[in-house]
Amino acid sequence: MTTGGKPLGIALVSGGMDSLVMAEFCTRESNLALLHVNYGQRTESRELSCFHAVAEHLKVPTRRRLVVDIGYLAQIGGSALTDDRIDVPKADLARRGIPVTYVPFRNAHLVAIAVSWAEVIGAKNIYIGAVAADSSGYPDCRPEFFEAMNEAIRRGTKEGSGIVVKAPFVHLMKKDIVLMGKSMGVPFERSWSCYREGEKACGTCDSCALRLRAFAEAGVPDPLPYETRPDYARKSSS
């Protein structure tokens, strides 16, 4: 389906910085419908509020906004983001291995929902703001994951649907996403990256650390209030 000369696309918008910039960027290519998924995460209410703020910023009509609840991911557990019994760890950007904030196979669930909706509304492109190069190392954010998902979509959807999942930022550094967002005038204050729920971002979880480092490296002030703002600058090898 095309609207206004552009194909219809679905952007997965979590309410975070990456998906905010990605959604703005993808309006150049597609007329967007926006999808948000509640999965029992600690910051569910804050993320949902940011999703609606992004939708208003992009002037996406309510008929092209979808909010879906899949609380079963919290029932499954296994992640500090969905299980209050597992503490959100202090930031360690040099950590190797998969952190406890990884929600097992989450992106497969999100993409599957987006594909189902795409078949119904005639969308061709599905956009997700996954970042592999400068991130926490989640396995379902890797390029090969999305390649495999596209093969599954090709085999598992109606012939001629032409649905493709795109992760346009997967190879970018986060500072480049900040610079791109600044150049497009995105409202960073309407995004939330912290793994904890609070009036202010904690500044001490991995997600806050990655965001603070990205803004610092980009030389752009982060408009979010933080409980604390440690220096997460990369150490020089010299």
Predicted regions and their residues:
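Local cysteine-cluster metal-coordination motifs and their immediate loop/turn environment
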Residues: 112, 192-213
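Short, intrinsically disordered, charge-biased short linear motifs at domain edges
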Residues: 180-183, 188-197
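Charge-dense, low-complexity polyampholytic segments
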Residues: 126, 195-201, 220-228
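Alpha-helix termini
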Residues: 28-29, 51-53, 198, 216, ...
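Short alpha-helix boundary/capping motifs
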Residues: 54, 146, 205-210, 236
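ATP-dependent adenylation/nucleotidyltransferase module used to activate substrates
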Residues: 2-184
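Short Fe-S-cluster ligation motifs
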Residues: 209-211, 215-238
